[in-house]
Amino acid sequence: ESSVVPPTDGVSTTTDVSRVHFDHVDFTYPGADAPVLCDVTFTAEPGRTTAIIGSTGSGKTTLVSLVPRLFDATGGTVLVDGVDVRRLEPEVLWSRIGLVPQRAFLFSGTVASNLRYGRPDATDDELWAALRTAQAEDFVRAMPEQLEAPVAQGGANVSGGQRQRL
């Protein structure tokens, strides 16, 4: 049974600001003797780059996983736009977050079909804007078919860095 449960009185809206704040956050994996994260406090401001730096096993991925509630903090609070993520409706929370896993995976199809996976109604202009944001516009424009360029299963026909940006 999941320890992450939807709220009974969930908040269904947030602002368009998308500020993420960790307020004295702790996290301990079930059955672990020691916490992975201890008293972490910081704010990730919209439009700014926030770097999470640490050695292997230091909790970087765990920290990022707390925002979309892949896990819930065992202490402290994770807030999006001032609202505790545990109070946000899951659909609202997930619609506000773009999570790029360490091992990126692409489906067989086209650049456009992969980009539209999470939002089928996205326009070509919106796809180009997303590619700009991900610093992928230049290499996609260099492909002969651009948005309609074929993508092999798993993204085998693009580099690891390109795969992650897509």
Feature names for model-found ranges:
Residues 4-7, 11-166:
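ABC-type nucleotide-binding domain
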